[in-house]
């Protein structure tokens, strides 16, 4: 259930609305590490929003009854808040990228490397949220997230001098990190830019 991994409707007073944590304990509460921190992987959380919207769209296109449609609507309701909150926490505007880990207790980045893949994933999440929402403020926020991720990817990761091949990971200082994240050859079924193909399909619709 989404509310186990996210703070929805103020369920946990110690966390902000839309906070999303990576791990839960046996008590279905956020898992605290030895130092008391609660880990959020902003890239995973933002990726989840896009995949959730993709599932919800597919489910609505199937022949489902009214009760199922109502449940789908309830499931979708927290997604814009999660998108906006996690982007606000994880996106590092200077130089531009999404940090690998964030502490939900200390409210600070835990791992400041910024892998490439979280930016196109967040573009898909913002695009689908923009399409699904009827709220003007949410839609405007989605466009801003979409813009910031696009600009960060094009300006900081793509390298025109070598046929637009992208840097895999940047540090928060804007230098190239030796860390290797998910790559197309190691993960051929997913991390190959498929999220951007969904965005292209959105334009076609």
State the predicted function of each range.
Residues 1-205:
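Glycan-recognition and catalytic cores of secretory/periplasmic carbohydrate-active enzymes
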């Amino acid at each position: 259930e989404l509310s186990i991994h996210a703070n929805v409707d103020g369920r946990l007073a110690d966390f902000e609305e839309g906070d999303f944590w990576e791990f839960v304990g046996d008590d279905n509460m956020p898992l605290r590490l030895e130092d008391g921190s609660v880990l959020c992987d902003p890239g995973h959380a933002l990726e989840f929003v896009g995949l959730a919207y993709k599932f919800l769209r597919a489910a609505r296109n199937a022949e489902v009854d009214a009760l199922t449609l109502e449940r789908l609507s309830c499931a979708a309701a927290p997604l814009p808040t999660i998108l906006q909150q996690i982007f606000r926490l994880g996106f590092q505007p200077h130089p531009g990228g999404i940090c690998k880990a964030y502490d939900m207790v200390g409210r600070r980045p835990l791992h400041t490397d910024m892998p490439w893949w979280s930016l196109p994933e967040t573009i898909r999440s913002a695009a689908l949220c923009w399409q699904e929402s009827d709220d003007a403020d949410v839609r405007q926020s989605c466009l801003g997230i979409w813009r910031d991720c696009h600009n960060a990817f094009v300006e900081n990761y793509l390298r025109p001098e070598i046929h637009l091949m992208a840097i895999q990971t940047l540090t928060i200082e804007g230098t190239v990190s030796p860390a290797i994240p998910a790559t197309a050859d190691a993960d051929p079924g997913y991390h190959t830019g498929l999220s951007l193909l969904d965005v292209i399909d959105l334009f076609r619709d």
